[in-house]
A protein has these predicted regions:
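A short, acidic, amphipathic alpha-helical segment used as a generic capping/interface helix at domain edges
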Residues: 61-78, 111-119, 185-204, 230-242
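Short glycine/threonine-rich loop-to-helix capping motif typified by GTGT followed
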Residues: 53-58, 97-107, 139-152, 225, ...
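Membrane-embedded hairpin module used as a gating/binding unit in multi-pass transport
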Residues: 10-98
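Short, small-residue-biased leader/transition segments that mark boundaries at the very start
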Residues: 1-8
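Extended hydrophobic packing segments that form well-structured cores
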Residues: 198-274
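Solvent-exposed alpha-helices and their adjacent loops that cap or buttress functional pockets
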Residues: 1, 31-35, 77-81, 121-123, ...
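C-terminal catalytic subdomain
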Residues: 106-210
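Structural motif
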Residues: 85-90, 130, 251-252
Length: 274
């Protein structure tokens, strides 16, 4: 029904109750069953500056729900009094998964989607992201030796959206040279790229447009379906003409990727559904 569809559209793209999250739990419990004893786990809740604010130890099935109660209070912030049309932030070259996170095009898409995941609750359905990135062509091939090949494949052979790449997952996951680099050269496992693309598609699904500003190699960004402009001002004016109208509500997040992130929520909704 259309009502059910509307509810689905309002839901955040990921949650602590998703199939992926429950599968993580099932995998751990299956390992415990085969080992014949449970894991002893220590779970620390960190604040915005990565300081420990709570520490729980014990059997994961019992301990983790208690840990998440505190983590949810720190993470989900009921704040917004209105929905926003445009989200502004910057993307450094080195963060999260390592140097090149903000310049490798597939890793860039994962980072853009992470912002959608965090702040979808306070953004309009046709929202626009404007993000600065040096986008200089640095793939960091030593860390992600498979991503240049994935990116090139995405440019050809009817690859219109990132999920079209899914059929190559096993092909990359069994590539012996990539596996050797994972085992001996500190590279990521080749299937990690498919995890990144799975997340990376969330940004396209939940935005009207994404602009990268200040790119040295803008063609790399355009190859991922992103729009490119020289400055924030140019991107905002273009977004106003094409997507948001003349008076957009703008959410500027200057500390993005510098501090431990929160998930912004509507003030009146509190932490419902997190």
């Amino acid at each position: 029904s259309s009502a059910a569809s509307d509810v689905y559209k309002r839901q955040p793209p990921v949650s602590g109750h998703s199939l992926m999250r429950t599968k993580f739990d099932e995998i751990g419990m299956h390992m415990e069953e085969k080992m014949g004893h449970p894991f002893f786990c220590c779970d620390a809740v960190l604040d915005t500056y990565s300081r420990q604010i709570a520490l729980y130890s014990g059997y994961a099935k019992v301990m983790q729900p208690e840990s998440w109660k505190i983590a949810d209070i720190r993470t989900y912030v009921p704040w917004a009094e209105k929905k926003y049309d445009i989200m502004l932030f910057g993307m450094p070259q080195a963060f999260h998964y390592g140097d090149g996170m903000g310049t490798n095009p597939i890793q860039m898409m994962q980072a853009l989607s992470a912002q959608v995941i965090r702040h979808k609750r306070v953004m309009k359905d046709n929202c626009v992201i404007i993000c600065s990135s040096i986008c200089n062509g640095y793939f960091h091939d030593e860390r992600w030796p498979y991503l240049r090949e994935l990116y090139e494949m995405f440019q050809h052979d009817y690859m219109n959206i990132l999920p079209d790449m899914n059929r190559y997952g096993e092909y990359f996951a069994t590539n012996q040279e990539y596996i050797r680099k994972y085992r001996f050269c500190n590279a990521f496992h080749p299937f990690h790229g498919f995890s990144m693309m799975s997340c990376g598609h969330i940004a396209e699904m939940n935005t009207a447009a994404i602009y990268i500003v200040g790119a040295q190699e803008p063609g790399i960004a355009r190859g991922m379906g992103l729009k490119t402009r020289a400055t924030f001002e140019e991107a905002i004016e273009d977004a106003k003409r094409k997507f948001t109208g003349p008076n957009p509500n703008i959410l500027a997040l200057p500390q993005t990727f510098k501090l431990g992130a929160v998930h912004l929520c509507m003030k009146e909704e509190g932490r419902q559904g997190v």
